[in-house]
Amino acid sequence: MQKDDVAGRITAVAEQVLTPQGLELVEVEYKREGRQMVLRLFVDKPGGISLDDCAAVSRELSEILDVEDFIRENYTLEVSSPGLNRPLKKEADYERYAGRLVKVRTFELLADEEGNRRKTFLGDLVGLSDGVVTLTLREGQLARIPLDKIAKANLEFEF
């Protein structure tokens, strides 16, 4: 089974485990690290996730994956919080984290309000409207970035 297929199947199984517990699946990674495959799930909930939450999800998910047995190779299962630099994956994330400092990387060069072209934008998240993410950049101007042009977006920790 291809890595993308595994991630898709895992997402479906994980949602069944997480949703009843009020947990959110933020991201799934299935990749080779050294000689071993690693299946890594990042989960969260309002107020933050605890180590006990991660352990409980890991146990329950491990039991289901052992029964379903669609991953043919040996792998290590890791369940973790998304951390301080949490990725923004869903449209709702852009509303939930409005006011927070974010870094956005785009697939191509885009112009900010002053016409400067760049692929990386750092600023305070204003929100999402009509498929466009708006940031107030550190330099003070606004950047409007179409959601479909975003390669990666994540919260940034302010010191």
From Swiss-Prot:
Gene Ontology terms: biological process: ribosomal small subunit assembly; translation
Subcellular location: Cytoplasm
Keywords: Cytoplasm, Ribosome biogenesis
GO terms under cellular component: cytosol
Main location, first listed in the record: cytoplasm
Entry-linked HAMAP family: RimP
Family membership: Belongs to the RimP family.
Function as written in the Swiss-Prot or TrEMBL entry: Required for maturation of 30S ribosomal subunits.
Database matches in NCBIfam families: PRK14647.1
Protein name: Ribosome maturation factor RimP
Species of the source: Geobacter sulfurreducens (strain ATCC 51573 / DSM 12127 / PCA)
